[in-house]
Amino acid sequence: MITSSTERSASYLEKTAVVQNEHNGDLEISSPGGGPGTANMNPPESVGFSRGQQSLDHSVWYNGALMTFLATGEDTHGQFALIEAVGRRGSDAPPHIHHREDEIFYVLEGEIVFSVNDRTIKGTPGTMVFLPRDVRHSFTIESEQYRMLILVTPSGFEAWFREFGVPAPAMTLPPANEPAYGEVQRMLEAAPRYGLEFVLPQNP
């Protein structure tokens, strides 16, 4: 798992400190002026939503995967977006860099190999990978199918999947013969709007 400095962690959580208990691995959350187990929950409306089972209203087909938005920036006042991705072999992500948001990937099913700068991480069920912004990364699906959660903070990048995906007609995977990326040139042109940088192969 990739960790960041204390300073970056503080900025990620808007001055909420996250402390890893060295004795039992428990995660304690504290905020300025509060003890362990408390956190700054302002504005209070930001915790006042819930979402039930998966719905077509919140799902798209993107790059051979079914992407379901469990929470979006509209739900969380821009603090984070949570997405469930279900796909098959070939739903890979090319090398790229996010300049605006941090990502957390949590593998639920299947095997996914993450490349983070020059490091390789094998993700199996239960693996969590934290990717801070400005870090080059990609991933390759090694199993026939996979399922994972993607947390993006702050929110906003979920709009990319809506722009380049299509509304899912059913809670199923896209057809296996559907092209992975059908609008590559338009993606390259749109990337700067999302603070996204694709790392293209260098010419020999």
Label every PLM stretch briefly.
Residues 2-3, 8-80, 173-204:
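A short, N-terminal "cap"/entry segment at the start of jelly-roll beta-barrel domains
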Residues 147, 159-174:
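A hydrophobic, small-residue-rich beta->alpha segment in the mid-to-C-terminal subdomain
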Residues 82, 130-131, 143-160:
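A short hydrophobic beta-strand segment most commonly corresponding to one strand
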Residues 82-89, 97-116, 151-154:
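Short, conserved beta-strand element in jelly-roll/cupin
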Residues 71-72, 92-99, 140-142:
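Short histidine-centered beta-strand/loop micro-motifs
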Residues 118-136:
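Short acidic-glycine-tyrosine-enriched beta hairpin
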Residues 64-67, 90-91, 132-135:
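Short acidic (Asp/Glu) patches
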Residues 66, 104, 111-113, 120, ...:
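Structural motif
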